[in-house]
């Protein structure tokens, strides 16, 4: 009995670890740090910003990762940060990256696949 309980626990743990998102908001912030000046004032988009956008896009391959990235990106368009929401929303396109959802506060990240 104890052995079967242990096996069930390990299977549950493996399932939970396997479905957990590998991307964190810390990772998103790190990848997009070089975008902050551009997101405040516009101008010329820094090459490092586009490199970070591409890196983040390449990391977000699973549904949980995309949903986490979506929620993290939504936090960037929060008016209290002083970033221009329209500029933030346009960064992926300016970098030639197509993401499957708009970056805006109203986006329902639970629907991102």
Swiss-Prot record:
Q: Could you confirm whether the keyword Transport appears in this record? A: yes
Recorded GO terms, molecular function?
lipid binding
What disulfide bonds does the UniProt entry report for this chain?
25-72, 35-49, 50-95, 70-109
| Expression sites (tissue/organ) | Highly expressed in style and stigma, abundant in young leaves and petals, and low expression in young anthers at pollen mother cell stage with an active tapetum. Not expressed in mature leaves or in pollen grains or tubes. Found in the stylar transmitting tract epidermis and in the stylar extracellular matrix.
User: What SMART domains does this protein's entry cite?
Assistant: AAI
* Signal peptide segment: 1-22
Q: Which UniProt keywords apply?
A: Disulfide bond, Lipid-binding, Signal, Transport
User: What is the superkingdom listed in this entry's lineage?
Assistant: Eukaryota
- What this protein is called in its record is Stigma/stylar cysteine-rich adhesin
Q: What species is given as this protein's source?
A: Lilium longiflorum (Trumpet lily)
